[in-house]
A protein has these predicted regions:
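Specific transmembrane helices
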Residues: 25-110, 129-141
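Membrane-embedded catalytic scaffold of the fatty acid hydroxylase/desaturase
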Residues: 81-93, 105, 112, 116-290
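Short, strongly hydrophobic alpha-helical membrane anchors
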Residues: 1-20
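Short, charged cytosolic
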Residues: 1-3, 46-61, 146-162
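A transmembrane-helix-recognition feature enriched in membrane-embedded lipid enzymes
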Residues: 72-75, 268-279, 308-311, 315-322, ...
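Membrane-helix interfacial "entry" motifs
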Residues: 14-21, 63, 67, 71, ...
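A membrane-cytosol interface segment of integral membrane proteins
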Residues: 210-212, 284-332
Length: 332
């Protein structure tokens, strides 16, 4: 009974954390996203000499063809399952970023000896830490994303996310548990090692500037266009901005069924690692015709059970030698 109580309690707190003020789906984040979307909508309407009406804005932001699509209902089911049901499993199976940080400090101390903190201004140390933590987060995200696209047995799990035929904010957690755990742990290791090295060098002042208890850079991203990555709203960045940041259009190209867009734009908030490793594709300013989904295998993802079970089967097939049947065996 104690286990069941802990399971229910931890799951409840995990779910609630996503909706707290500092959570990704907290009221400040979602309200600011709506205001940002309104700003984009109003600016475009006025550029065409048309009034910006609230009713039209809401209709364009939440079109019936998307809100009532079967893909959206699957988004809802997987979103609820991953947050409210499986949340505790993720917290138990995830590496502790703070633990990695402390282990890194200990390892550096053993290898290099005690180190007096560098006497730099606190604001400068925090700025360096904020940027370094963001880059470490993004590198881990890019690397994990690259692996799930590069190796077919991992792609089978990532297909769950790409199976979305339309995209909404909830598509973010249209993910297989294997993928979620992989990303969470990669990010924990990357950011933990980075923060450990910075703490060893600069002392306890090495922590990020925060907004609503999160890295200020990531939170600003979520409070503006971050939630629009998975949407039908075409907002693209060109020039230097398009090389530094992931616009919603960057990620919409990533989900495209056009082979020219495959394996592009693997970053989360930043485009710098895509730029560095040759996986960047800058979207055009005007809306490109983009279709989403994974084609003929969509039927594998029309129920929650299939969505979670089929990737294991298909992934295993990549390691199982194919025995020729009489019909497929080569003929002399």
């Amino acid at each position: 009974m104690e286990f069941l109580h802990r399971l229910a309690t931890d799951d409840f707190h995990y779910a609630v954390a996503n909706f707290k003020s500092g959570g990704p789906y907290g009221i400040p984040s979602l309200v600011c996203t709506l205001l940002f979307a309104w700003f984009v909508f109003a600016r475009r309407r006025r550029a065409r000499g048309r009034p910006a009406e609230l009713k039209l804005f809401l209709r364009s932001l939440f079109p019936r063809r998307i809100m009532l699509h079967r893909s959206t209902f699957m988004d809802m089911r997987l979103w609820i399952l991953n947050i409210a049901v499986l949340g505790v499993a993720y917290t138990w199976l995830a590496v502790s970023g703070l633990g990695v940080r402390d282990a890194t400090i200990g390892a550096l101390t053993r290898m290099l000896g005690e180190h007096a903190p560098t006497p730099w201004p606190l604001a400068l140390v925090m700025a360096i830490t904020t940027l370094s933590a963001l880059l470490a987060y993004e590198l881990a995200y890019w690397f994990g994303h690259y692996l799930f696209h590069r190796f077919e047995f991992l792609w089978e799990f990532h297909k769950v996310h790409h199976s979305a035929e339309v995209m909404t904010t909830l598509t973010e957690l249209r993910q297989h548990p294997v993928e979620i755990l992989a990303f969470v742990n990669l990010i924990a290791v990357s950011t933990g090692v980075t923060l450990g090295a910075l703490t060893y060098a600069f002392g306890p002042g090495a922590h990020s500037f925060t907004l609503l208890n999160a890295n200020i850079a990531l939170m600003l991203f979520l409070m503006t266009w971050g939630h629009l990555r998975h949407s039908h709203i075409w907002l693209s960045f060109q020039g230097l901005a398009g090389h530094l940041f992931q616009s919603p259009a960057h990620h919409q190209l990533h989900h495209s069924t056009n082979p020219e867009h495959f394996n592009k734009n693997l970053g989360f908030a930043l485009a710098v690692w895509d730029w560095a490793f040759g996986t960047l594709r800058i979207p055009t300013k005007t809306c490109e015709v983009v279709e989403f989904g994974v084609g003929e295998t969509h039927g594998d993802y029309d129920t929650v059970l299939r969505t979670f079970a089929r990737p294991f089967q298909r992934s295993a097939e990549h390691f199982t030698p194919v025995v020729p049947t009489p019909e497929s065996a080569p003929r002399a």
